[in-house]
């Protein structure tokens, strides 16, 4: 590489400055360099883009040039990573626009691969100092948030496995997390009796809601008048608590609009349909109550579990492929009418809400079922348990299709899955979050 006169002069000046700062050990070299190139002894000045002098440099020139290279390399890598993320998001959105939005992949024979989680995990995220109680995947970006008994909410990149930051504000266990449909805001709830709303662009806590008399177990945003994927703003939030109530919050005022007292014991979990028209709650009294948003009154009671209901999820139109032939179950006629639940009785149940009937009972776990969710393609139920496993159930055939044994070193407390990106995330009592690839 041939240096220009200006580059050569800068290099000589930098070497002269560096050697001179080392003391008498390099005095002869300094004198020789000054004799060979007298201009290198002139104090170095920086110039602005318009050519005017900006004054003497404060940072030694050679060190500045030396450290600039890795700094620029790091910046290039970060920009490449961001470009890759945006390209993937664009590709998945394009696929969703033409294929119903569900996670699918061609198997090369004209069919769709199942895209189910597999061993080994892609990343193990470590940083919490206590039990991980909840995880939630960002609806757009390759980001996952986790809540813990250490009182913190941590933000991670689930693609690279990198830690991003910690959201501090709660003073006790964080039990639940929820994103708005666009991912612009995050809600967290805690044993400290508070709900916090976070601006997820600035990571600032913008509002704290108080009103429950005991541990707050779960929160969920309640869309109104639009689909979950297109509603840009949620005006209401639901919260469930050990005080046996569910509260409905107005997010603009920060006040509680309504308190629902139907449960007679700890309310542990909440779920809502994509359009917010129907939502459900469940907990220690083993009953699942389903409500209509327009009336905010109990519409259906689902009974059958023998112990605490830990988790519920709706099987909604958004999880079903557009091709009716691919609907997930022989039972299902109106897919918006179905709900899945997991319980400490070690079972996973599928319910037909309108008939208040249990369609199937899936028995495979050897301990409490802690979390359930519906695969985005609508064909599978995923569950995690205190038996340390993650299981995948085939709804159509009513059987356990895949098991990730010893997915964690302790109870698997929480699961979440991205709607379009091929990633499953789990949280555990072993204080870690694990990211599972799908194939």
Curated annotation (Swiss-Prot):
Mapped WD repeat ranges: 127-166, 169-210, 212-259, 262-301, 304-361, 364-405, 407-439
Physiological role: Positively regulates the activity of the minus-end directed microtubule motor protein dynein. May enhance dynein-mediated microtubule sliding by targeting dynein to the microtubule plus end. Required for several dynein- and microtubule-dependent processes.
Lineage: Eukaryota, Sar, Stramenopiles, Ochrophyta, Bacillariophyta
One GO molecular-function entry: dynein complex binding
Pfam family, one: WD40
Chain residue ranges for the region called Disordered: 85-106
Protein name stated in the entry: Lissencephaly-1 homolog
GO CC aspect terms: centrosome; cytoplasm; microtubule; microtubule associated complex
Family: Belongs to the WD repeat LIS1/nudF family.
Annotated localization: Cytoplasm, Cytoskeleton; Cytoplasm, Cytoskeleton, Microtubule organizing center, Centrosome
Native organism: Phaeodactylum tricornutum (strain CCAP 1055/1)
Coarse class of the protein's main subcellular location: cytoplasm
Any one of the GO BP annotations: microtubule sliding
InterPro entries xref list: Dynein_regulator_LIS1, G-protein_beta_WD-40_rep, LIS1_N, WD40/YVTN_repeat-like_dom_sf, WD40_repeat_CS, WD40_repeat_dom_sf, WD40_rpt
Keyword Transport: yes
Keywords tagged on the record: Cell cycle, Cell division, Coiled coil, Cytoplasm, Cytoskeleton, Microtubule, Mitosis, Repeat, Transport, WD repeat
């Amino acid at each position: 590489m041939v240096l220009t006169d200006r580059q050569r002069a800068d290099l000589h000046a930098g070497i002269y400055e560096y050697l001179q700062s080392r003391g008498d050990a390099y005095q002869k070299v300094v004198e020789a360099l000054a004799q060979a190139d007298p201009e290198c002894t002139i104090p170095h000045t920086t110039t602005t883009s318009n050519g005017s002098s900006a004054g003497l440099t404060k940072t030694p020139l050679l060190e500045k040039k030396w450290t600039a290279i890795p700094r620029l390399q790091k910046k290039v890598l970060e920009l490449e990573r961001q470009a890759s993320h945006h390209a993937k998001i664009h590709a998945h959105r394009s696929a969703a626009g033409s294929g119903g939005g569900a996670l699918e992949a061609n198997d090369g024979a004209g069919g769709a691969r199942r895209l189910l989680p597999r061993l080994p995990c892609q990343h193990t995220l470590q940083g919490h100092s206590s039990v991980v109680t909840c995880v939630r995947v960002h609806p757009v970006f390759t980001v996952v948030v986790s809540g813990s008994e250490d009182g913190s909410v941590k933000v991670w990149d689930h693609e690279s496995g990198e830690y991003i930051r910690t959201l501090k504000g709660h003073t006790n266990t964080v039990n639940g997390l929820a994103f708005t449909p666009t991912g612009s805001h995050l809600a967290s709830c805690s044993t400290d009796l508070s709900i916090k709303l976070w601006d997820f662009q600035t990571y600032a806590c913008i509002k704290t809601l108080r009103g429950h008399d005991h541990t707050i177990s779960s929160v969920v945003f309640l869309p109104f008048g639009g689909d979950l994927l297109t509603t840009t703003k949620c005006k209401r939030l639901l919260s469930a608590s050990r005080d046996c109530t569910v509260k409905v919050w107005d997010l603009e005022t920060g006040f509680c609009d309504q308190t629902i007292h139907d449960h007679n014991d700890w309310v542990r979990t909440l779920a809502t349909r994509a359009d917010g028209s129907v939502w459900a709650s469940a907990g220690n009294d083993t009953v699942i109550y389903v409500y209509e948003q327009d009336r905010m009154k109990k519409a259906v009671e689902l009974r059958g579990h023998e112990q605490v209901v830990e988790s519920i999820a709706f099987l909604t139109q958004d999880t079903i492929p557009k091709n009716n032939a691919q609907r997930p179950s022989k039972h299902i006629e109106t897919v918006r009418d179905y709900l899945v639940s997991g319980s400490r009785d070690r079972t996973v149940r599928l319910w037909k809400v309108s008939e208040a009937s249990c369609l199937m009972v899936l028995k495979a776990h050897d301990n409490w079922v802690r979390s359930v969710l519906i695969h985005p393609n609508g064909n599978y139920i995923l569950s995690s348990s205190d038996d340390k496993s993650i299981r995948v159930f085939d709804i159509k055939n009513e059987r356990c299709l895949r098991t990730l044994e010893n997915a964690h070193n302790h109870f698997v407390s929480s699961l979440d899955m991205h709607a379009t990106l091929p990633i499953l995330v789990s949280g555990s009592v072993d204080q870690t979050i694990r990211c599972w690839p799908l194939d």
